[in-house]
Amino acid sequence: MQVHVGLTLLLCAVLLSSATASSDDESNQDESIDSKSSLPADESVKDHSTTGRVVAGQIFVDSEDPEVESPLQEEEESSKTEEEVSVGEEISFVESPSLSSKSYEEAKRARKPVLTAIEGTAHGEPCHFPFLFLDKEYDECTSDGRQDGRLWCATTYDYKTDEKWGFCETEEDAAKRRQMQEAEMIYQAGMKILNGSNRKSQKREAYRYLQKAAGMNHTKALERVSYALLFGDYLTQNIQAAKEMFEKLTEEGSPKGQTALGFLYVSGLGVNSSQAKALVYYTFGALGGNLIAHMVLGYRYWAGIGVLQSCESVLTHYRLVANHVASDISLTGGSVVQRIRLPDEVENPGMNSGMLEEDLIQYYQFLAEKGDVQAQVGLGQLHLHGGRGVEQNHQRAFDYFNLAANAGNSHAMAFLGKMYSEGSDIVPQSNETALHYFKKAADMGNPVGQSGLGMAYLYGRGIQVNYDLALKYFQKAAEQGWVDGQLQLGSMYYNGIGVKRDYKQALKYFNLASQGGHILAFYNLAQMHASGTGVMRSCHTAVELFKNVCERGRWSERLMTAYNSYKDGDYNAAVVQYLLLAEQGYEVAQSNAAFILDQREATIVGENETYPRALLHWNRAASQGYTVARIKLGDYHFYGFGTDVDYETAFIHYRLASEQQHSAQAMFNLGYMHEKGLGIKQDIHLAKRFYDMAAEASPDAQVPVFLALCKLGVVYFLQYIREANIRDIFTQLDMDQLLGPEWDLYLMTIIALLLGTVIAYRQRQHQDVPVPRPPGPWPAPPQQEGPPEQQPPQ
């Protein structure tokens, strides 16, 4: 009977062994390993500590000491019956035919891991050698079962049973890991200081931390420091050092590094300019997900710079960026950025740039402290959104709104509701508190509070969802012209929430909200035009709207950083920042970069490259409709700055500025070119016509136009004398017909000018003081090396 039982058990063991072998063959052929026997993904080890010791393997010795057996093995062996042991020996013999069952068991017991100074996984756990995986024994770390080739080991004998494992690492890998852990700690410390303070001294200290982390090859620290060196942000500007860091980042596959290197090749900063290389790096940066690279490529396809113009390609890039910008828009609306054009500020010093003077801010603060509610609300809004020379500060905004709300101001209550609904480091998020303030403001008829209450009912924030009440409050807010109410009404009609879907109504309210400058209204309109929803599909309209949204992204804050650098006299830092923004398609950055180059204030660009680069950016700004840039293009071709003298091209640019933007300066220049016959056939009558048009277009042009007409009268008189018969001149000469009914006034003006010139000349001789030259009525040239070929008389 025992023989039959033994044979039966042996037969079962053989069958079991063959089944196991066949399953091994099938599992080897299949690419995916069974979940019970395959290694988990990398994500499964994220909870492990990363403060372990170095591992390179284990040292094994032959040992017959039974005390080194693991408790698990002792428990298993003690629980086995003699019959089970014999079956196990038979099975082991079948699985390992090269060893006898006895020798195999002895070898398995003898080979025990011995803890040494070098041990364990990257998580500080000892490797167990040998260990079983897929019914195979491994005496060292292996990459089996992993697609990425990383080495691993089991930390218990049977991986299939316990599934305890870890990655192995070499001494070098462990040193790198510890270094990166230290670098990460330093980086986080620097970022905490950088984000938690507005003081320049503390920000410089933060960058010292970041520089140290960058020296340890921390990728994010390298990106921060390299851009700081490029722009001169709290570090001394160093283009060469920035370039080296960008190259290092590019080798590591950093999209930010690739985008920045593309910018350097475009602008020729630290490298020889190469549009082809720039396009390659921009493309790689965009493929890596860098939003600035997408903006650059979108603008290049829009303007046809280095690539063929393609509306659909522009739409692809701009839509991707706009999606991110729209998703970042908070309930409070985000920060506000002023777009200040340096040429306008210089030509019109009295023009309001939108920036508040420090004295005026202090005056408002004084009024707020004295209890002026309007000053409190105004300062609260300034600090909530930032802009106009005031830094964003939620703590101050909250304090000012609290003061005004306690005084019963409904607007302050509504904005407190917004701050509580959004939540921040200063104001904890609380739907109940937000709802309280929204209700109080809405009961007082405040549109901001009504819109906030509508949002609460629409999304169920602190109250049960009620689409009818949401629609009611949005309508009340929209009737008072509040853009948030108009936007939400449009969204409800667009999506059919609480109302019947109506794209015409959605389009109506989105248009109203866009007129108030709401970013999400532009975004929704762009989506409708891009997909042809409710309107005729228009790629060009969608692109213009998406471009508007993209330019409201967080990177637009650098416009103010560049402006502040310019005001501080750091022209090199300002021009580099404007040049990068110009690559992204910002017209104001293009004109400001061209202006700085035109004034030769930036030494970072070589003298031979100054005017050609300025001409390039004037051209790009003009293509986006900036009048001054169009006139500057005419001036550059008129005087030959950065290009050859070309009167015909200059005439074309002046005419475009005259016809499209009704520029008085362009009309005056056209009159002068008609008078002199430059780039066009000489025509005194057309010259007078353009002079008159310039005087009508701008009151500031009346004086130079009057002087130009006086000169034109003399020119016409001399021309008439040359063409007329000298003997008939006195019989045919009619001064009224020749110079107009006010010819005597012209004559007196000429005499007065001559007399003034003589007096000024005599005074200069006596005082030895040069007389300042009066401004000429012709195109004002930039500073130049030598006199132009064709210079109008003073």
Curated annotation (Swiss-Prot):
<feature type="signal peptide">
    <location>
        <begin position="1"/>
        <end position="21"/>
    </location>
</feature>
<feature type="region of interest" description="Disordered">
    <location>
        <begin position="20"/>
        <end position="91"/>
    </location>
</feature>
<dbReference type="Pfam" id="PF00040">
    <property type="entry name" value="fn2"/>
</dbReference>
<keyword id="KW-0914">Notch signaling pathway</keyword>
<keyword id="KW-0256">Endoplasmic reticulum</keyword>
<feature type="repeat" description="Sel1-like 2">
    <location>
        <begin position="219"/>
        <end position="254"/>
    </location>
</feature>
<feature type="glycosylation site" description="N-linked (GlcNAc...) asparagine">
    <location>
        <position position="272"/>
    </location>
</feature>
<feature type="repeat" description="Sel1-like 8">
    <location>
        <begin position="483"/>
        <end position="518"/>
    </location>
</feature>
<keyword id="KW-0597">Phosphoprotein</keyword>
<keyword id="KW-0677">Repeat</keyword>
<feature type="domain" description="Fibronectin type-II">
    <location>
        <begin position="122"/>
        <end position="170"/>
    </location>
</feature>
<comment type="subunit">
    <text>Homodimer and homooligomer. May form a complex with ERLEC1, HSPA5, OS9, and SYVN1. Interacts with FOXRED2 and EDEM1. Interacts with LPL and LMF1; may stabilize the complex formed by LPL and LMF1 and thereby promote the export of LPL dimers. Component of the HRD1 complex, which comprises at least SYNV1/HRD1, DERL1/2, FAM8A1, HERPUD1/HERP, OS9, SEL1L and UBE2J1. SYNV1 assembles with SEL1L and FAM8A1 through its transmembrane domains, but interaction with its cytoplasmic domain is required to confer stability to FAM8A1 and enhance recruitment of HERPUD1. The interaction with SYNV1/HRD1 is direct.</text>
</comment>
<feature type="disulfide bond">
    <location>
        <begin position="127"/>
        <end position="153"/>
    </location>
</feature>
<dbReference type="GO" id="GO:0006641">
    <property type="term" value="P:triglyceride metabolic process"/>
</dbReference>
<feature type="repeat" description="Sel1-like 1">
    <location>
        <begin position="183"/>
        <end position="218"/>
    </location>
</feature>
<feature type="repeat" description="Sel1-like 4">
    <location>
        <begin position="291"/>
        <end position="326"/>
    </location>
</feature>
<feature type="repeat" description="Sel1-like 10">
    <location>
        <begin position="627"/>
        <end position="662"/>
    </location>
</feature>
<comment type="similarity">
    <text>Belongs to the sel-1 family.</text>
</comment>
<feature type="topological domain" description="Lumenal">
    <location>
        <begin position="22"/>
        <end position="738"/>
    </location>
</feature>
<keyword id="KW-1015">Disulfide bond</keyword>
<feature type="compositionally biased region" description="Pro residues">
    <location>
        <begin position="771"/>
        <end position="794"/>
    </location>
</feature>
<feature type="glycosylation site" description="N-linked (GlcNAc...) asparagine">
    <location>
        <position position="217"/>
    </location>
</feature>
<dbReference type="Pfam" id="PF08238">
    <property type="entry name" value="Sel1"/>
</dbReference>
<feature type="glycosylation site" description="N-linked (GlcNAc...) asparagine">
    <location>
        <position position="608"/>
    </location>
</feature>
<keyword id="KW-0325">Glycoprotein</keyword>
<feature type="compositionally biased region" description="Acidic residues">
    <location>
        <begin position="62"/>
        <end position="77"/>
    </location>
</feature>
<feature type="modified residue" description="Phosphoserine">
    <location>
        <position position="63"/>
    </location>
</feature>
<dbReference type="GO" id="GO:0005783">
    <property type="term" value="C:endoplasmic reticulum"/>
</dbReference>
<feature type="repeat" description="Sel1-like 6">
    <location>
        <begin position="410"/>
        <end position="446"/>
    </location>
</feature>
<feature type="region of interest" description="Disordered">
    <location>
        <begin position="768"/>
        <end position="794"/>
    </location>
</feature>
<dbReference type="GO" id="GO:0000839">
    <property type="term" value="C:Hrd1p ubiquitin ligase ERAD-L complex"/>
</dbReference>
<dbReference type="GO" id="GO:0009306">
    <property type="term" value="P:protein secretion"/>
</dbReference>
<comment type="function">
    <text>Plays a role in the endoplasmic reticulum quality control (ERQC) system also called ER-associated degradation (ERAD) involved in ubiquitin-dependent degradation of misfolded endoplasmic reticulum proteins. Enhances SYVN1 stability. Plays a role in LPL maturation and secretion. Required for normal differentiation of the pancreas epithelium, and for normal exocrine function and survival of pancreatic cells. May play a role in Notch signaling.</text>
</comment>
<feature type="repeat" description="Sel1-like 5">
    <location>
        <begin position="373"/>
        <end position="409"/>
    </location>
</feature>
<dbReference type="InterPro" id="IPR000562">
    <property type="entry name" value="FN_type2_dom"/>
</dbReference>
<keyword id="KW-0732">Signal</keyword>
<keyword id="KW-1133">Transmembrane helix</keyword>
<dbReference type="InterPro" id="IPR050767">
    <property type="entry name" value="Sel1_AlgK"/>
</dbReference>
<protein>
    <recommendedName>
        <fullName>Protein sel-1 homolog 1</fullName>
    </recommendedName>
</protein>
<feature type="region of interest" description="Mediates retention in the endoplasmic reticulum">
    <location>
        <begin position="738"/>
        <end position="794"/>
    </location>
</feature>
<feature type="region of interest" description="Important for homodimerization and oligomerization">
    <location>
        <begin position="352"/>
        <end position="537"/>
    </location>
</feature>
<feature type="disulfide bond">
    <location>
        <begin position="141"/>
        <end position="168"/>
    </location>
</feature>
